[in-house]
A protein has these predicted regions:
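Short, positively charged patches
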Residues: 8-11, 48-52, 63
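N-terminal glycine-rich phosphate/adenylate-binding segment common to multiple enzyme folds
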Residues: 53, 57-65, 75
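Glycine-rich phosphate-binding loops that contact phosphosugars or nucleotide phosphates
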Residues: 65, 69-182
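Cofactor-/ligand-binding subdomain signature composed of acidic, glycine-rich
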Residues: 1-39, 43
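Structured helix-beta-strand junction loops
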Residues: 32, 60-61, 174
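Short gly/ser-rich anion-binding loops that grip negatively charged ligand groups
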Residues: 37, 44, 105-109
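Short secondary-structure boundary/capping elements
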Residues: 17-21, 46, 111-118
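A short, well-structured juxtamembrane/interface segment
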Residues: 42-57
Length: 182
């Protein structure tokens, strides 16, 4: 079965941002920002389910891992880095990994997102195990690095979730607890 085009790649009124005035750009960004709370509200039950399983696993000594590529990976690393000072948890309770490694936080690492096996190798460096939870982050829901990591984690009995901005994506189908904000 051929996968449909990700929602993030469908035609939209934003295909030609370069033709908009600064005022039009700002107005459109602001209008899109206004839609976020409603879109989040629509998936609150899914968010709750994922959080419940993460909390249960952490109570058993488990950790939360994020994997992503590009901006999605950076957001996972950012969230993980904020957990110790904000919530007083240890540095190894929430771990963010980005395709291409730490170098990719500041510079693009071309094609790192296309390696379906690298995420699992990266996760093994942290001794990921069955008490842990892996959350894949990919706006399109099609990033091979993230999908490969989720699939390998599931094969090894690790609970998986995802955050994506495309409905019925390969990533959402591979995850046990998908969150699709569309």
């Amino acid at each position: 079965m051929k996968d449909k085009k990700p929602d993030t790649e469908k035609p939209s009124k934003y295909d030609h941002l370069e033709k908009m005035s600064i005022s039009e750009l700002l107005l459109n960004i602001n209008n899109e920002d206004k839609t976020v709370p409603q879109k989040i509200e629509e998936v609150l039950p899914n968010i709750e389910s994922l959080i419940e399983v993460i909390v249960a696993k952490m109570k058993q000594g488990g950790r939360l891992f994020y994997i992503g590529a590009g901006t999605s990976g950076r957001l996972g690393v950012l969230d993980a880095s904020e957990c110790p000072p904000t919530y007083g948890v240890s540095d190894n309770m929430v771990i963010g990994l980005i395709a291409g490694g730490d170098y990719a936080l500041r510079k693009a690492v071309e094609n790192a997102e296309d390696d379906t096996e690298q995420a699992w190798k990266d996760l093994q460096e942290y001794d990921i195990e069955k008490n842990d939870v892996l959350v894949g982050i990919a706006a399109s829901g099609t990033t091979p690095y993230v999908i490969g990591g989720i699939k390998d984690a599931r094969k090894n009995g690790i609970t998986t979730g995802c955050i994506t901005c495309s409905s019925d994506s390969p990533l959402a189908r591979a995850s046990e607890y998908p969150i699709e904000v569309v």
